[in-house]
């Protein structure tokens, strides 16, 4: 599949193109909850406002979004039906969980990534000194929406905001009667709230990865070639890594994998394809992504916290032409291990350096591998 310049421009969603909806949820009138920015970058996410701008509606198997808030602002307690991954881009946040936010809390700092379990009430506040910015990955093309804590729902209704059965907000002017009960999403019954699993801080933070914990390794066949010293560090699920000792922080299935990639100055990956749709969320450093081959080649330079949609089957290459390392997150659809497909010349060059893939698709010394068995 070829990517044209026009298509690449459409798929490279720059941070300056993200469009905030400042009243995406029913908690926007609660004290300490406004102003608050919600961004739907790839897919609608869980917005409850029909006017939310969505940069790219194409299904990827997951949604990419973001939230921005000033110091002291809170995103109130709610639960998801699929995974919610927080990527702390800028600022410092305090996570809280439980129906009243009293079951535990943890600090989320710049560069941290945490995978929040489904069916757990969670919220977060900007407890730093500057504007905070989080990016999110939500499992599934249809996330199913969210359930608000009953306490949040009651307080939101007192401000005139109700939630209809279509998961959209109903704004009732002061002094007007409440909407008919059969048109509203009901509050979660107390017995169901009590039945939810409780998570202690140690359990939750076992699902987080801090910058110092990133296990960067030479992890793909091409990375043994001169000038191709890029590295991977798994976060969630099983991604591109072909290193047999790599283990993600979160191994239970979420429907997607998340890995940090690091490209040192002057290094690159070889061009490769994947059978799955992917998204690159760029953190920092001079990173270009090139597509196609020969005269059809097109490329784009990523900016900080830009998002790039990479369709399945496209030939892509990560290149650092600068003087400092580049870091980005690669999110790929599916729970199974991914199999990056390199040109035969990459395999031949790696073999000359005594490196190959074993029968389990892991890196191994070619000199240790027996001849292929006839089938």
Task: Describe each model-derived feature in a short phrase.
Residues 71, 81-99, 264-267, 274-293:
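Glycine- and acidic-residue-biased ligand/ion/polar-headgroup-sensing regions
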Residues 99-117, 293-312:
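Short acidic-glycine-tyrosine-enriched beta hairpin
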Residues 3, 10, 121-197, 317-375:
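Double-stranded beta-helix
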Residues 52-57, 74-80, 97, 105-107, ...:
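Short histidine-centered beta-strand/loop micro-motifs
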Residues 74-76, 94, 113-114, 118-124, ...:
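Histidine-centered metal-chelating micro-motifs
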Residues 45-52, 63-80, 241-246, 257-275, ...:
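Conserved short histidine dyad/triad with adjacent acidic residue
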Residues 1-60, 163-254, 361-375:
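A short, N-terminal "cap"/entry segment at the start of jelly-roll beta-barrel domains
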């Amino acid at each position: 599949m070829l990517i044209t310049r026009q298509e690449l421009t459409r798929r490279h969603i720059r941070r300056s193109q993200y469009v905030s909806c400042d009243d995406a949820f029913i908690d926007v009138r609660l004290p300490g909850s406004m102003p608050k920015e919600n961004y739907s970058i790839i897919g609608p996410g869980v917005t409850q406002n029909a006017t939310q701008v969505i940069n790219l509606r194409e299904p990827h198997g997951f949604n990419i979004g973001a939230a921005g808030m000033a110091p002291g602002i809170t995103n109130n307690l709610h639960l998801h039906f699929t995974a919610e991954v927080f990527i702390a881009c800028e600022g410092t946040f305090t996570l809280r969980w439980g129906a009243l936010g009293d079951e535990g809390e943890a600090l989320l700092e710049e560069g941290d990534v945490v995978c929040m379990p489904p069916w757990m009430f969670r919220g977060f506040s900007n407890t730093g000194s500057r504007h905070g910015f989080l990016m999110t990955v939500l499992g599934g093309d249809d996330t199913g929406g969210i359930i608000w804590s009953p306490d949040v729902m009651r307080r939101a209704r007192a401000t005139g905001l109700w939630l209809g059965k279509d998961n959209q907000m109903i704004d009732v002017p002061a002094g007007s009667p409440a909407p008919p009960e059969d048109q509203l999403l009901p509050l979660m019954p107390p017995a169901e709230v009590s039945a939810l699993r409780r998570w202690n801080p140690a359990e939750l933070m076992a699902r987080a990865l801090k910058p110092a914990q990133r296990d960067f390794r030479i992890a793909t066949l091409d990375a043994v070639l001169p000038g191709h010293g890029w590295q991977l560090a798994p976060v969630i699920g099983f991604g591109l890594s072909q290193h047999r000792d790599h283990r993600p922080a979160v191994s239970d299935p979420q429907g997607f994998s998340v890995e940090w990639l690091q490209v040192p100055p002057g290094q690159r990956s070889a061009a490769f394809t994947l059978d799955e749709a992917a998204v690159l969320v760029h953190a920092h450093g001079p990173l270009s992504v090139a597509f196609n081959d020969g005269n059809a080649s097109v490329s784009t330079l990523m900016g900080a916290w830009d998002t790039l949609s990479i369709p399945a089957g496209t030939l892509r290459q990560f290149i650092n032409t600068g003087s400092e390392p580049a870091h980005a997150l690669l999110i790929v659809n599916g729970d199974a291990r991914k199999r990056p497909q390199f040109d035969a010349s990459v395999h031949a060059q790696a073999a000359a350096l005594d490196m190959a893939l074993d029968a389990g698709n892991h890196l191994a010394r070619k000199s240790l591998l027996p001849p292929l068995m006839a089938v």
